[in-house]
Amino acid sequence: MLSLLGLLLAFTFSMSASRFEARKQVVLQDANAIGTTFLRTQLLSTAGQTIQAQGLLRSYVATRLQIYAAPAGSPAQKAAAVQMQALQHDLWDLVATDSRQHPNAVSTALLLTSLNEMIDLSETQVTIFANHVPEDILLLLLIMSTITVAMVAFLNGKGGKHQRLFTIILAATIALTIFIVLDLDRPQRGLIRVGVGSVERAQAMIESKR
């Protein structure tokens, strides 16, 4: 029973850790896409369009940070998501208008490409952050853990202090492992969170270009 529980714990921890790493990667990609799009706004046809696009991107990166900071599914996160979509729409309209006016401009095509990637990554981030370890697996893990600890406690119940201590340590170790699995699987709450330093650095870069 202990061996089976160990395999299940290892499998679940691996699932949780891989999802955590995927979330870290999408945050980095998000920051890179925002930074690239900002730099390419200088390729717009007029200085006025560049200033307008950069202003929208300043608001956009601030909104992205609000989405990362807010608890998943909270009213604050939903409001920030609505604002983000409006900013994406405004940015796309601005760049698309310039592209229609200058259909042969390679520079505008480059900006459209990076803007499209930035918008796509915002949706990818939502999908990856919502991709949790299946609840059925977590439920099975909890049931298996409870049964295993109960069996060990029963078998060691008539033993001495050393056997009771072993049972306590085993239960604590299993509980701690499950806690870490759950914490890794919830990136916007708990103790272990996905860092957004790369997005903050992108924001600092954008603000420095005023």
Language model features: what each stretch is:
Residues A22-V26, A79, Q83, L110, ...:
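Short, contiguous, pocket-lining structural segments
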Residues T37-A130:
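Structured inter-helical modules in multipass membrane proteins
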Residues T127-R210:
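Alpha-helical transmembrane anchor segments
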